[in-house]
């Protein structure tokens, strides 16, 4: 696919021109998956950890480093794995990666295979939640629970895209070029829309821009176009236990109904964070950690 080839070339060009001095406060490494190399953090020092496992995925333009506080809260209780999806952060996309549901699920299950993780809870957000759903459909015996933030139904997400995402990003090739040229501007403006008005966006922006300077990618056009090709009904009827965490002050999702997610998983519980925007896991990590631990079945754990 031409769009995938364009993304592949643009992201590698940016990486080749970068400073190469990422602020790697967390010990990360790259591993191979069926859909390419991805950058991961793993709290386990070996593959023999007996703790329950949770897998986190940053919602771009966030990167793994944005999750340092949440990781610190969860690590005493869980094996914590965090990885950049292909096309985001430092997981540069392959020339055939089209951000389809099946490819996203392959990335998730590929990480689990590489790290010898039998079962895990997936704690994803926004568009990445759809890849978590497909992973649960593909390997229901391995995905024990879903904890998803700001993920509505795919129908509602398509409507959100039409309202919020500038039209050039929805056009193949043009979107890839525009997204690459203006990724810094897009990241700055995105935090202003996604966060509550009272929240200082500077710490979020600083980590993102530092990552960009070090060669990180932000293939927003690719994921928008990839999910636009998917049929909403293909994600209906997921039976995996699921919790939705919804930030009420997310201006980008002002007209999105979190209850729409029931189309995908009728059994889902919805937890509202009235004081949060688009990133409840980052804005209120201690509260989010308690919700996550309780969902996993560790209600007595103190984050």
What are these regions (language model features)?
Residues 248-253:
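Acidic catalytic loop of the alpha/beta-hydrolase fold
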Residues 273-289:
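Catalytic histidine-centered segment of alpha/beta-hydrolase-like enzymes
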Residues 39, 43-90:
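Conserved HGGG/HGGXW glycine-rich cap/lid loop of the alpha/beta-hydrolase fold
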Residues 81-127, 290:
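Active-site loop/oxyanion-hole signature of alpha/beta-hydrolase fold enzymes
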Residues 137, 144-175:
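Flexible "cap/lid" loop of the alpha/beta hydrolase fold
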Residues 157-159, 179-237:
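Conserved alpha/beta-hydrolase catalytic His-Asp/Glu region
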Residues 1-54, 77-78, 117-118, 296-303:
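Alpha/beta-hydrolase fold catalytic core
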